[in-house]
Amino acid sequence: MNTGEMKINWVSRYMPLLNKIAEEYSREKPLSGFTVGMSIHLEAKTAYLAITLSKLGAKVVITGSNPLSTQDDVAEALRSKGITVYARRTHDESIYRENLMKVLDERPDFIIDDGGDLTVISHTEREEVLENLKGVSEETTTGVRRLKALEETGKLRVPVIAVNDSKMKYLFDNRYGTGQSTWDAIMRNTNLLVAGKNVVVAGYGWCGRGIALRAAGLGARVIVTEVDPVKAVEAIMDGFTVMPMKEAVKIADFVITASGNTDVLSKEDILSLKDGAVLANAGHFNVEIPVRVLEEIAVEKFEARPNVTGYTLENGKTVFLLAEGRLVNLAAGDGHPVEIMDLSFALQIFAVLYLLENHRKMSPKVYMLPDEIDERVARMKLDSLGVKIDELTEKQRRYLRSWQ
């Protein structure tokens, strides 16, 4: 048994929702005759999602959603199980794009996207794919933002379900998943102490909240930078310090970006960093930390540790960048905890099944996943934990419906 198969077997023990879905639908096989194209961080948990979809009858074609997040041993294990895989860990963007194209060559009926690349390419460079494409399920904040922008231009041609905007996704995956996995990656790759350090978190959305929460739990002094005044007030009320980035970088031991935006640090911010400061990105794309600026102002670049690049700046200070500025928890770690992704991937499967049943009456726009599916996943999770909750009485239901 290779390491990839061992990893998949391990996660399968801790994904009760996917196991339950496979048990419920494997005889009916509702996806029989349909192709699901996936662009997703290819590691053990996503591999198990692909396997579960295949148990529901789908032909699954999968590639990575980030050049550095594919785990080659897992990709090989998936191939051995009959899944079509076009992916390998690479620093070459052209190979990454080539693999996206290969997935689209299979003319998928449904796309499960992570960041929106497959969907955007199918609407721009590969429009023939749209003839067969029935709908898209998008996993990430970044991807949903891109596809809503596509919708606003009037160019979106298929219905999209924003799985990211489901409560059972963002309240758990974005917050607890990102919080734990980001710090797991930072600590395993630097071996540095967090307690007593100044941690700057750029962006206080659900991902930023999780990163800040776990940093505080590790004993750090947490500083949040924001452009949204409401989120800034939230961060203050949660007990964190808020200040502009240009001030925060002067005292930062760690800077972690989670804004979903570009160029979160300026050249001046980088030059103001302390000697030995560590930079990590928890956003989907490698645009939040301006690596090109680091390259321009560095007089020396060197590998300090695996996944850690040192840059000696023109002012004599050295700063360290993790995972080339890519998504640190996946490019330099194993991603979110297994049980968290069990929730998100249950939502993904139900999104595909919803599209299968309803795509003909859906317009080409971005939809929320229906509340009843969110609630179904929540109840499945409670059942897997053996937890019971109260139910409203009929009197209570009448009271909530009344206006007098």
From Swiss-Prot:
<dbReference type="GO" id="GO:0004013">
    <property type="term" value="F:adenosylhomocysteinase activity"/>
</dbReference>
<feature type="binding site">
    <location>
        <position position="261"/>
    </location>
    <ligand>
        <name>NAD(+)</name>
    </ligand>
</feature>
<keyword id="KW-0963">Cytoplasm</keyword>
<dbReference type="InterPro" id="IPR036291">
    <property type="entry name" value="NAD(P)-bd_dom_sf"/>
</dbReference>
<dbReference type="InterPro" id="IPR020082">
    <property type="entry name" value="S-Ado-L-homoCys_hydrolase_CS"/>
</dbReference>
<dbReference type="InterPro" id="IPR000043">
    <property type="entry name" value="Adenosylhomocysteinase-like"/>
</dbReference>
<dbReference type="GO" id="GO:0033353">
    <property type="term" value="P:S-adenosylmethionine cycle"/>
</dbReference>
<dbReference type="GO" id="GO:0006730">
    <property type="term" value="P:one-carbon metabolic process"/>
</dbReference>
<feature type="binding site">
    <location>
        <position position="173"/>
    </location>
    <ligand>
        <name>substrate</name>
    </ligand>
</feature>
<dbReference type="GO" id="GO:0071269">
    <property type="term" value="P:L-homocysteine biosynthetic process"/>
</dbReference>
<feature type="binding site">
    <location>
        <begin position="282"/>
        <end position="284"/>
    </location>
    <ligand>
        <name>NAD(+)</name>
    </ligand>
</feature>
<feature type="binding site">
    <location>
        <position position="139"/>
    </location>
    <ligand>
        <name>substrate</name>
    </ligand>
</feature>
<protein>
    <recommendedName>
        <fullName>Adenosylhomocysteinase</fullName>
        <ecNumber>3.13.2.1</ecNumber>
    </recommendedName>
</protein>
<keyword id="KW-0378">Hydrolase</keyword>
<feature type="binding site">
    <location>
        <position position="169"/>
    </location>
    <ligand>
        <name>substrate</name>
    </ligand>
</feature>
<comment type="pathway">
    <text>Amino-acid biosynthesis; L-homocysteine biosynthesis; L-homocysteine from S-adenosyl-L-homocysteine: step 1/1.</text>
</comment>
<dbReference type="GO" id="GO:0005829">
    <property type="term" value="C:cytosol"/>
</dbReference>
<feature type="binding site">
    <location>
        <begin position="203"/>
        <end position="208"/>
    </location>
    <ligand>
        <name>NAD(+)</name>
    </ligand>
</feature>
<feature type="binding site">
    <location>
        <position position="329"/>
    </location>
    <ligand>
        <name>NAD(+)</name>
    </ligand>
</feature>
<dbReference type="InterPro" id="IPR042172">
    <property type="entry name" value="Adenosylhomocyst_ase-like_sf"/>
</dbReference>
<feature type="binding site">
    <location>
        <position position="114"/>
    </location>
    <ligand>
        <name>substrate</name>
    </ligand>
</feature>
<comment type="similarity">
    <text>Belongs to the adenosylhomocysteinase family.</text>
</comment>
<keyword id="KW-0520">NAD</keyword>
<dbReference type="InterPro" id="IPR015878">
    <property type="entry name" value="Ado_hCys_hydrolase_NAD-bd"/>
</dbReference>
<feature type="binding site">
    <location>
        <position position="174"/>
    </location>
    <ligand>
        <name>NAD(+)</name>
    </ligand>
</feature>
<feature type="binding site">
    <location>
        <begin position="140"/>
        <end position="142"/>
    </location>
    <ligand>
        <name>NAD(+)</name>
    </ligand>
</feature>
<keyword id="KW-0554">One-carbon metabolism</keyword>
<comment type="function">
    <text>May play a key role in the regulation of the intracellular concentration of adenosylhomocysteine.</text>
</comment>
<dbReference type="Pfam" id="PF05221">
    <property type="entry name" value="AdoHcyase"/>
</dbReference>
<dbReference type="Pfam" id="PF00670">
    <property type="entry name" value="AdoHcyase_NAD"/>
</dbReference>
<feature type="binding site">
    <location>
        <position position="226"/>
    </location>
    <ligand>
        <name>NAD(+)</name>
    </ligand>
</feature>
